[in-house]
A protein has these predicted regions:
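Globin-like tetrapyrrole-binding proteins
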Residues: 11-162, 167
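Ferredoxin-reductase
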Residues: 156-191
Length: 191
């Protein structure tokens, strides 16, 4: 697979479309196994990325379900961009809050596509892998553009550290998670 942003087009190619439609059910049925394998693989190769993920959601499988759900929803609703806009906006906001950079999409794409082949084996032919690579990069390019607009609005650079903030509320969200309500200091903004 090419593993480069699909900036040359914004729609799924006619060769990829039937492959995606035919394989969505198989990938949905194996989505959690694929994404769990993906996270393990990516964190083994890039342990520095662990701090971007809620490890409680990793352990529970919520993160794996969220990633699988987002990619498959995108693949099945690509012809109705308005359907995916609210979810993509939420994902972009979350990514900006974490300082996600465009370069990190290459890492994610590489490990996600490799995980498809490693979990599903021979069922993932080169043509099917290329079709899913295309879907991934269409979604990634969309998210990168949304995130760029948010960064521009905030006058931040992608990956920029958060400004100093004031904690105005602290509450236990679960046994191992604390939720903080933050307030920007004068002259600063939050995503």
């Amino acid at each position: 697979s090419h593993l480069t942003p699909a900036s040359e087009h914004t729609m799924l190619s006619t060769t990829a479309r039937p492959l995606i439609e035919a394989t969505v059910p198989v990938l949905l049925a194996n989505g959690e196994a694929i994404t769990r394998h993906f996270y393990q693989r990516m964190f083994t190769h890039h342990p520095e990325l662990k701090n971007l993920f809620n490890m409680g959601n990793q352990a529970s499988g919520n993160q794996a379900q969220a990633l699988a759900g987002a990619v498959y929803a995108y693949a099945t609703h690509m012809d109705q961009p308005q359907t995916m806009a609210p979810a993509l906006n939420r994902i972009a906001q979350k990514h900006v809050s974490l300082g996600i950079t465009p370069a990190q999409y290459t890492i994610v794409g590489r490990h996600l596509l490799a995980s498809l082949g490693e979990v599903l084996g021979a069922a993932i032919t080169p043509d099917i892998a290329e079709a899913w690579d295309e879907v991934y990069w269409l979604m990634a390019t969309d998210l990168i553009a949304r995130e760029a607009r948010i960064y521009q609005t905030l006058r931040w650079e992608a990956g920029q550290a958060w400004p100093e903030v004031r904690v105005v509320q602290r509450e236990a969200a679960s046994a191992d998670t604390v939720a903080l309500t933050l307030q920007a200091l004068p002259g600063h903004s939050l995503p």
